[in-house]
Amino acid sequence: MTLWSAEHAALATGGQAVGDWAVTGVSIDTRTLQTGDLFVALKAARDGHDFVANALAAGAGAALVSRVPDGVDDTAPLLIVPDVQAALEDLGR
């Protein structure tokens, strides 16, 4: 079941969706990512942007990012926002 489409996620966050995608879950960790999840590139002790390419290769439906990460094609399924944490909160509303 679709949790968010690219269009809905972009409207909810004010972000820019790249591509036409839909996601079925959410993950902040590539080790527990399920196929179809939205990978959220949070910045904490490590920068989640460093793991976006791996997440997409592992089957993430899209990634929530503040920039196109190194090693990720600019046509990859992304939701680009100014603030990843704030956008995640917006999606939760």
Which residue ranges define each predicted feature?
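N-terminal leader/targeting and accessory segments in enzymes
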Residues: 1-90
